[in-house]
Amino acid sequence: MIYFEVDTEELSHAIRGLNIPKSKLNSILKTAVNRTARQAKTWLPEEAEDRYHIKRRGQVKKGLKMTGAKISSPVAHIISSGHANDLYDFNVTSRRYSPGNRPPSGHKANVLRANSPVALMLKPNAGRDKYRAFVVKYKSNHIALAQRIPGKKMEGNSKKEAIRNLYSISTPAMLGYEKGVMAKVSPKTEALLASEVAKGIERYLKL
């Protein structure tokens, strides 16, 4: 969860001489906080895309829910929901689903743009495709990266080993990573919030 608020006690002390009623000040803060939070909902997916090889930025934004500030409580919350993302949602080579023509060297993937692609193989130098990752397409038409599970048989076909999808970082973890996405978004939201509060006070004083 990401939240936005203003230190009302410190602000009240700073503007004591302006004689702004507390109810009006809280109204100014509510507007400023909500405008900042709405902008942050746009910045977060953008910064995530800059840092990660995420293929579906729209899904990241869709998973963000905002609880707006109120006059009685000028605090806004942005909540990110979602489970681990399919590794296929990030940078994968090759992305092609072709069971009869898989890449001889296997598939590679990377999640962070700063990192180089890594070969997806459970056992180094595994013969053929047995323990290499491969692109799979389910009856629902969902496409993912998967690998065989050594020693576990597939239900309904004991001659084959079972498969499991490969996952990566969840969207909440991606957005809340303090050295990554939030490290870039926080300074911008702090500056915007201060600016919006100042604009609100200026508008009031001009009445």
Positions of PLM-derived features:
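Short, Lys/Arg-rich flexible segments
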Residues: 1-207
